[in-house]
């Protein structure tokens, strides 16, 4: 499924009508289209305009948006990641609402206004995390070509991905009827590099339409809070002009035309009679509006009764004519929820003027191998898969504060059934110290009460090494060893440790008691690096100090398979300090041999090396340094030549760029054991528990 994100370049560009008009145009192309407004435009819980029209006119099964107040609170508390995960969940729900699955999801961004100054960056983040191509919506009302070109250029740069992709096109609304279209387009292209290059194609120019902008007389009455003296056809007639009676009737008579709203004090008998005569002569006036709380004298009312009590709407307000006209000029352009006819005509009008044939072809194209997995989608899928797995995960550092908090969160969210190895009273004290309540589903096992149960099984597992019972008892004093024995005996499905222990403390018992999976020659590790635009894999950055060429090939294959298992299309870059044939020496040759071995063992995996990091990750550099590479500039799996390089790089990227690193996730063990960084945050521990739960499912399936 492809996603289109509809984004405004400024306020008042007709965002909602364009988004829904595009939806209609794509449906005419035979595409199955879903719709989503992820964040509501207002703080109130009232029905969002976009959602209302999508459900009413497009019959879309679209979920309720996140309230703007909720989104603002999450942003203010630094919880943008959680907000984006919720948006991804809504996108999945919207797509699932289309029978047989949607071909495309149309997502409407937030309109820009003075109240939500954060909307621009938030829209860019939404588009990025939904892996969406962006349609920019702008307006020709009140701007010069120079301003419009700058506006489109700036917006396009904000949404354009680092590889130049991500722009689907732009739409111009409210075009003057006398517009010199060819001249405007030439002017815009001369002023904007992106428009000149064709990266941002024009999808349509929507002309101004006074008819579509015309509210019903009923809408005017609601806006003014007017008293309805005679409803007549107030629900049917539309206001296309306003006549404020400041002159004599002979000088205004020509203005009494179809759709005119006549605004007058009730004591202007000449105007009242002229309006009545116009109505009786067959002119469908929009209505007669009395100002200053006045009405005509009784004698005039009797003379005009045939008109004033028929289909002509008659209203009254307390304000004077000047203030009333001023309020009318400030009437919102939005279409009321009960004006289906106007919105239907608006959507058809826009859909008729959008060139969606090329866009439809693009949207029908297969996903291919260039798909990216955005961070929010990765986190969402991680949690959903872990919930579905419902695995029991042991945490040997059971009274460590971050671990306790993470375990509580996992149990409360149904991510995993966590088992804390610690004295129950100590865990309760840690929880109370953080203001937390231990949930009923959180299991706490006192290790002192169960250690003896594992002495004999451990001696049996290690009898080939001559392990004695006293030695086993001593080793089982270490909770990591105890937890590993629980895993070896299938009492739990996975183990997570390392918040206070070293990597060696976590991995050594696993290698001794769990051992490697069948056919696996070594254990390695990967980090999932949650870059701004996509999730990539770094390996090995935690386990193997200096792998040889064969081991490096094994690490690459393991890492690619892990990437694919977690939804990341693997494109392997075998990293070195040189690219292609430009370097020589033992270090480069090791990478070159490892690359050849990967190709021989797994011809299904796109791989290239040696590649420098910039050639592997930056498209423009990759095209220059390795123009014929299937991976350069698009790598998703980065294999480092040694631990020194890998660990240093992952920490540099994590800290300098503020990138979340999930892991390390160990690969190659018969059952899942995962290590934590001693600087791990609570979120890091939660995601590592989720990874472990998913690995446990994969281990069962592969057994």
From Swiss-Prot:
GO BP terms, alphabetized: acetyl-CoA biosynthetic process
Give the molecular function GO annotations.
phosphate acetyltransferase activity
**Which family, according to UniProt?**
In the N-terminal section; belongs to the CobB/CobQ family.
Is Cytoplasm one of the keywords? yes
- Alphabetical list of PANTHER family matching this protein: PHOSPHATE ACETYLTRANSFERASE
**Entry-linked NCBIfam families:** PRK05632.1, PRK09653.1, pta
Q: What is this protein called?
A: Phosphate acetyltransferase
What are the transmembrane regions? none
């Amino acid at each position: 499924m492809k996603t289109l994100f509809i984004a405004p370049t400024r306020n008042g560009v007709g965002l909602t009508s364009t988004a829904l008009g595009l939806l209609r145009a794509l449906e005419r192309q035979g595409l199955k289209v879903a719709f989503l407004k992820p964040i509501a435009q207002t703080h109130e819980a009232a029905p969002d305009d976009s959602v209302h029209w999508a459900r009413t006119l497009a019959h879309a099964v679209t979920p309720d948006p996140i309230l703007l107040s909720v989104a603002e609170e999450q942003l203010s508390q630094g919880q943008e990641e959680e907000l984006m995960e919720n948006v991804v969940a809504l996108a999945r729900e919207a797509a699932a609402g289309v029978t047989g699955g949607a071909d495309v999801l149309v997502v409407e961004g937030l309109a820009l206004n003075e109240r939500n100054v954060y909307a621009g960056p938030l829209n860019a983040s939404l588009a990025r995390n939904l892996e969406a191509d962006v349609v920019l919506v702008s307006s020709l009302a009140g701007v010069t070509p120079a301003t419009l070109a700058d506006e489109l250029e700036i917006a396009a740069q904000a949404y354009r991905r680092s590889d130049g992709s991500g722009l689907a096109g732009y739409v111009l609304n409210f075009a003057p009827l006398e517009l010199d279209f060819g001249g405007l387009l030439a002017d815009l292209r001369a002023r904007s590099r992106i428009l000149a290059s064709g990266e941002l194609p024009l999808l349509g120019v929507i002309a101004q339409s006074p008819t579509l902008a015309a509210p019903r007389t009923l809408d005017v009455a609601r806006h003014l809070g007017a008293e309805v003296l005679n409803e007549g056809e107030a629900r049917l007639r539309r206001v296309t002009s306003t006549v404020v009676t400041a002159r004599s009737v002979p000088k205004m008579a020509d203005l009494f035309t179809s759709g005119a709203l006549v605004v007058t004090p009730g004591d202007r008998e000449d105007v009242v009679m002229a309006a009545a005569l116009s109505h009786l002569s067959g002119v469908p006036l929009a209505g007669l509006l009395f100002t200053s709380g006045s009405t005509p004298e009784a004698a005039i009312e009797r003379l005009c009764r045939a008109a004033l009590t028929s289909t002509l709407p008659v209203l009254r307000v307390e304000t004077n004519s000047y203030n009333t006209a001023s309020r009318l000029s400030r009437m919102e352009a939005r279409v009321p929820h009960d004006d289906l006819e106007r919105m239907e005509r608006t959507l058809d009008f826009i859909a008729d003027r959008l060139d969606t044939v090329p866009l439809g072809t693009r949207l029908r194209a297969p996903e291919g191998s260039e798909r990216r997995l955005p961070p929010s989608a990765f986190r969402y899928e991680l949690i959903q898969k872990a919930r579905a797995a419902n695995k029991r995960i042991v945490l040997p550092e059971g009274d460590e504060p971050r671990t306790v908090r993470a375990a509580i969160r996992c149990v409360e969210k149904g991510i995993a059934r966590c088992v804390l190895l610690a004295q129950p009273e100590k865990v309760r004290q840690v929880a109370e110290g953080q203001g937390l309540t231990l949930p009923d589903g959180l299991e706490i096992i006192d290790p002192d009460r169960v250690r003896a149960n594992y002495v004999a099984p451990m001696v049996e597992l290690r009898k080939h090494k001559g392990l004695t019972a006293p030695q086993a008892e001593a080793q089982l004093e270490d909770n990591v060893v105890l937890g590993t024995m629980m895993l070896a005996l299938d009492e739990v499905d996975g183990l997570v440790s390392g918040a206070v222990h070293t990597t060696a403390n976590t991995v050594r018992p696993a290698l001794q008691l769990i051992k490697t999976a069948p056919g696996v020659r070594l254990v390695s590790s990967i980090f999932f690096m949650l870059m701004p635009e996509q999730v990539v894999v770094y390996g090995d950055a935690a386990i193997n100090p200096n792998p040889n060429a064969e081991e490096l090939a094994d690490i690459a294959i393991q890492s690619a398979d892990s990437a694919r298992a977690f939804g990341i299309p693997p494109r392997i870059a075998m990293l070195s300090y040189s690219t292609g044939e430009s370097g020589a020496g033992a270090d480069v040759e090791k990478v070159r041999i490892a690359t050849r071995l990967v190709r021989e063992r797994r011809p299904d995996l796109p791989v290239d090396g040696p590649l420098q990091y910039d050639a592997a990750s930056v498209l423009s550099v990759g095209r220059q340094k390795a123009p014929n590479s299937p991976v350069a500039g698009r790598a998703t799996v980065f294999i480092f030549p040694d631990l020194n390089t890998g660990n240093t790089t992952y920490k540099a990227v994590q800290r300098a760029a503020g990138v979340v690193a999930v892991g390390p996730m160990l690969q190659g063990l018969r059952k899942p054991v995962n290590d934590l960084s001693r600087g791990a945050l609570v979120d890091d521990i939660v995601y590592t528990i989720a990874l472990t739960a998913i690995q446990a499912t994969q281990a069962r399936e592969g057994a």
